[in-house]
């Protein structure tokens, strides 16, 4: 199956990640491999690129497209929240770089047939892992209470008309179950009051359902709790987010890791002994250029945050070769 995806802010990612020959780099959201191919060119001849993705189509495509560099490439059908376990499988202490692109691939939107897009009439599935397991989006909209649906739309979609939309869904599912993306989009559009906005009225509802079905924020939190253990000293982490929920989680975790002394400000000397664990590389989020937005409108809401793991006493200098740890 042809796999189409346009990578966002490729040059900015390369600049922040700074891959070099011999490095181990993990692309935790492999997709079509756009970022990965550019990274691989910079870590050859002795580097190792590791990819993870929940979408089996992405894994199959990667195996075919990167067959020419099989000694420098490994791909896993797994969630990025399990990168530490993946590194263990590879016999690695850590990586020199990790990149996550938290956006939904064009392939999932346009080719998967799983109802990710409100512009298509497809079965309302929304599971990124098409191999099965876990509830589908249609299970959620047909079985959850009105209050539960409203909470999901408000919490994960920041949808201000969440209660109104949830009420309409519950009403309409009594006529017949809601099983397709097109019908759900029509129901949401019929419930929304006010003049048409810049985005489709179903945008936030579809985002919320996708996040809930795939437990996306929990996986992001899990990864961020283990990210330091995944990086070698001097290793860098670069995360591209597309909505404020993800960005707030990343910003908060980066700030916590970069914080030093936590003693009250009126203490004359530090007694906590806490030291910063990372250096934040993006004092302000990096956004796409106007030229990129014009070329790829889907990039308009992208934001990059990046950090570098600081070397600690006894760990040696940063930037060491991850493959040497095998």
From Swiss-Prot:
A GO cellular-component term linked to this record: cytoplasm
Function: Specifically methylates the N4 position of cytidine in position 1402 (C1402) of 16S rRNA.
GO biological process: rRNA base methylation
Family: Belongs to the methyltransferase superfamily. RsmH family.
Catalytic activity, EC: 2.1.1.199
Keywords: Cytoplasm, Methyltransferase, rRNA processing, S-adenosyl-L-methionine, Transferase
GO molecular function: rRNA (cytosine-N4-)-methyltransferase activity
Protein name: Ribosomal RNA small subunit methyltransferase H
Broad class of enzyme this protein falls into: transferase
Pfam families (UniProt xref): Methyltransf_5
Organism: Desulfatibacillum aliphaticivorans
Claim: Methyltransferase is one of the keywords in the record: yes
Enzymatic reactions: cytidine(1402) in 16S rRNA + S-adenosyl-L-methionine = N(4)-methylcytidine(1402) in 16S rRNA + S-adenosyl-L-homocysteine + H(+)
């Amino acid at each position: 199956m042809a796999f189409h995806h346009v990578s966002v802010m490729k040059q900015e990612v390369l600049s922040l990640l700074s891959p070099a020959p011999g490095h181990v780099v993990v692309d935790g959201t492999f997709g079509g491999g756009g970022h990965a191919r550019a990274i691989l060119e910079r870590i050859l001849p002795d580097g190792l690129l590791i990819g993870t993705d929940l979408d089996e189509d992405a894994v199959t495509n990667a195996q075919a497209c990167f067959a020419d560099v099989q000694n420098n490439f490994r791909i896993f059908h797994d969630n990025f929240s399990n990168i530490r376990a993946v590194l263990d499988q590879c016999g690695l202490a850590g990586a020199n770089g990790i990149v996550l692109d938290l956006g939904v691939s064009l392939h999932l939107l346009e080719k998967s047939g799983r109802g990710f897009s409100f512009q298509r009439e497809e079965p309302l599935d929304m599971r990124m892992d098409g191999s099965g397991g876990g509830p589908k989006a249609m299970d959620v909209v047909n079985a959850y209470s009105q209050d539960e649906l409203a909470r999901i739309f408000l919490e994960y979609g920041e949808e201000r008309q969440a209660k109104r939309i949830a009420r309409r869904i519950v009403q309409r599912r009594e006529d017949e179950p809601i099983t397709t993306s097109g019908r759900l989009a029509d129901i949401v559009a019929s419930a929304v009051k006010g003049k048409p906005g810049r985005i489709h009225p179903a945008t936030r509802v579809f985002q919320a359902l996708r996040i809930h079905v795939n437990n996306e924020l929990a996986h992001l939190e899990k990864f961020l709790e283990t990210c330091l253990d995944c990086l070698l000293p001097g290793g860098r982490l670069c995360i591209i987010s597309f909505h404020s929920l993800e960005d707030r989680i990343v910003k908060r975790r980066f700030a916590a890791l970069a914080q030093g002394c936590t003693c009250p400000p009126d203490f004359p000397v530090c007694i906590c002994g806490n030291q910063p664990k990372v250096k934040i590389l993006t004092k302000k989020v990096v956004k796409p250029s106007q030229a990129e937005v014009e070329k790829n409108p889907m990039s308009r809401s992208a934001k990059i945050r990046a950090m570098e793991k600081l070397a600690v006493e006894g760990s040696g200098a940063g930037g060491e070769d991850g493959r040497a740890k095998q």
